[in-house]
């Protein structure tokens, strides 16, 4: 498929086609240049995939999406097999084109007005007690999708009054005031927004995003709801140093964030940003110790940790790595 000149609405652009649209060019990694995964990065697949197929079927039946599938998460088999999933609202096409992410880029269609009801019913049918709701970036919407988040939260709580809801939100670039007015009126139980990496390489990792803007989003939500935990996550292995990661942790604490996730970046395809290093489990343990010493109440740090990986256990302060 050649580089599209005009993107067609509703078409998913992935891998080389997606990367061709990024202003900061990324050269595809030659296979012989790929870093070999260390032993600690090997995943054991479950012997029985019945539960996995059941969750996928429930998603398809209601026209829902999971970030687990759309972003090719390495923990999909484990989480689905335990009956948990992170739901991705507002469609499966992102208006951003971050070169670390496997979610498709393009011109998305209008949000499904029935999605909040379908999502709430699916969650009730699955009898979930803790759910994570995330979304693609929707720079095409005046509120960045904030009202859709609020509608989903309201619908879920109507069907499942005892449930705990964590939202993993985009940065609402250029729409922070409007988005926060909506989100603070219908708050989740945990408010999550990922910084992803360090300021020095932000333009390469998150083109179109701004490090300080993301910190401000987290801070302003916390100011509006001091009683609600705020959370953020980073990937390691993109060219940053451990010292830079620790400095980002300090920035997060200065902006009121109390929950942290650190995990290893994995290259979705050779067209995405390459893995520069694999961080050892011992290094993750050291960074967790630093985080707790800084005052984070929860810190999940490990090779396979993702922002929503065992989020229910993270919220309880249980060991996740």
UniProtKB/Swiss-Prot annotation:
Gene Ontology terms for molecular function: 4 iron, 4 sulfur cluster binding; lipoate synthase activity; metal ion binding; protein homodimerization activity
Chief location of this protein within or outside the cell: cytoplasm
Localization: Cytoplasm
Entry keywords, A to Z: 4Fe-4S, Cytoplasm, Iron, Iron-sulfur, Metal-binding, S-adenosyl-L-methionine, Transferase
UniProt-listed SUPFAM superfamilies: Radical SAM enzymes (SSF102114)
Residues holding [4Fe-4S] cluster 1: 68, 73, 79, 308
Activity regulation summary: Is physiologically inhibited by accumulation of the reaction product 5'-deoxyadenosine. Inhibited by the AdoMet analog S-adenosyl homocysteine.
Domain Radical SAM core positions: 80-297
Catalytic activity: [[Fe-S] cluster scaffold protein carrying a second [4Fe-4S](2+) cluster] + N(6)-octanoyl-L-lysyl-[protein] + 2 oxidized [2Fe-2S]-[ferredoxin] + 2 S-adenosyl-L-methionine + 4 H(+) = [[Fe-S] cluster scaffold protein] + N(6)-[(R)-dihydrolipoyl]-L-lysyl-[protein] + 4 Fe(3+) + 2 hydrogen sulfide + 2 5'-deoxyadenosine + 2 L-methionine + 2 reduced [2Fe-2S]-[ferredoxin]
Pathway where it operates: Protein modification; protein lipoylation via endogenous pathway; protein N(6)-(lipoyl)lysine from octanoyl-[acyl-carrier-protein]: step 2/2
A matching Pfam family: LIAS_N
GO cellular component: cytoplasm; cytosol
Obligatory cofactor(s): [4Fe-4S] cluster
Binding positions for [4Fe-4S] cluster 2 per the UniProt entry: 94, 98, 101
Record field: transmembrane: none
General remark: The source of sulfurs is the LipA protein itself, most likely one 4Fe-4S cluster.
Biological function: Free octanoate is not a substrate for LipA.
Subunit structure: Monomer or homodimer.
Family designation: Belongs to the radical SAM superfamily. Lipoyl synthase family.
Protein name (Swiss-Prot/TrEMBL): Lipoyl synthase
């Amino acid at each position: 498929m050649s580089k599209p000149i005009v993107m067609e609405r509703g078409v998913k652009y992935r891998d080389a086609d997606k990367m061709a649209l990024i202003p900061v060019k990324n050269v595809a990694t030659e296979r012989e240049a790929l870093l070999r995964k260390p032993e600690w990065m090997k995943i054991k697949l479950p012997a029985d995939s019945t539960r996995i197929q059941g969750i996928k079927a429930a998603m398809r039946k209601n026209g829902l999406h999971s970030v687990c599938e759309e972003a090719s998460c390495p923990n999909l088999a484990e989480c689905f097999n335990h009956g948990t999933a992170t739901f991705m609202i507002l469609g499966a096409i992102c208006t951003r084109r971050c070169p670390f992410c496997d979610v498709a880029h393009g011109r998305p269609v209008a949000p499904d007005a029935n999605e909040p009801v379908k999502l709430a019913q699916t969650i009730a049918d699955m009898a979930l007690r803790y759910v994570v709701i995330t979304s693609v970036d929707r720079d095409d919407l005046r509120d960045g999708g904030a009202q859709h988040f609020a509608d989903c939260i309201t619908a879920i709580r109507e069907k499942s009054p005892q449930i705990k809801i964590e939202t993993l939100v985009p940065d609402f670039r250029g729409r922070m005031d409007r988005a926060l007015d909506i989100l603070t009126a219908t708050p989740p139980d945990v408010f999550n927004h990922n910084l992803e990496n360090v300021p020095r390489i932000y333009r390469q990792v998150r083109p179109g995003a701004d490090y300080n803007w993301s910190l401000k989003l987290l801070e302003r939500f916390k100011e509006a709801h001091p009683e609600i935990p705020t959370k953020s996550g980073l990937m390691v292995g993109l060219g940053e140093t451990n010292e830079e990661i620790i400095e980002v942790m300090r920035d997060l604490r200065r902006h009121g964030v109390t929950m942290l996730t650190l995990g290893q970046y994995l290259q979705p395809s050779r067209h995405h940003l390459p893995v520069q290093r694999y961080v050892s489990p011992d290094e993750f343990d050291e960074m967790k110790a630093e985080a707790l010493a800084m005052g984070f109440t929860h810190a999940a740090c490990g090779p396979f940790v993702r922002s929503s990986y065992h989020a229910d256990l993270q919220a309880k302060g249980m060991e996740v790595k």
